[in-house]
């Protein structure tokens, strides 16, 4: 009876193992340290201010919105991913760029 159980264990272990000779050769060169899975540590998630922020986080984030690359004025092709001017057209250094959100005046002249 013990022989049958040993035979079953042996067959199960053989079924689990890969019979591909390439993987067998690759495993020979790996050490235990290589086989250990290393988890990459993620940076902590950034806190976002809520819509009706009362703790001051919204104001703090507005102050921090500055570009680290210094290429804001050149255009989107030269801007970094965290650039506050991302999506805006190129401008001269030192100029203040602002857009009117009221588009109704622009379209009224075309209809009249």
Swiss-Prot record:
Gene Ontology MF terms: 4 iron, 4 sulfur cluster binding; metal ion binding
Binding-site positions, [4Fe-4S] cluster: 69, 72, 80, 83
Keyword terms of this UniProt record: 4Fe-4S, Cytoplasm, Iron, Iron-sulfur, Metal-binding, Mitochondrion
Cofactor dependence: [4Fe-4S] cluster
Region (Disordered): 8-112
Motif Cx2C motif 1, chain ranges: 69-72
Region (Fe-S binding site B): 69-83
Domain of life: Eukaryota
Keyword Iron-sulfur assigned: yes
Subunit architecture: Monomer. Interacts with TAH18. Interacts with MIA40.
Protein name per UniProt: Fe-S cluster assembly protein DRE2
Gene symbol of the encoding locus: DRE2
């Amino acid at each position: 009876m013990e022989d049958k159980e040993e035979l079953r264990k042996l067959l199960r272990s053989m079924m689990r193992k890969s019979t591909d000779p390439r993987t067998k050769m690759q495993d020979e060169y790996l050490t235990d340290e290589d086989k250990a899975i290393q988890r990459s540590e993620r940076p902590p998630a950034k806190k976002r201010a809520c819509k009706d922020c009362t703790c001051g986080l919204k104001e703090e984030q507005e102050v921090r919105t500055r570009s680290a690359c210094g290429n804001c004025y050149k255009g989107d092709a030269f801007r970094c991913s965290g650039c506050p001017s991302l999506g805006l057209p190129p401008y001269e250094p030192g100029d203040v760029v602002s857009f009117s959100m009221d588009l109704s005046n622009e379209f009224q002249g075309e209809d009249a």
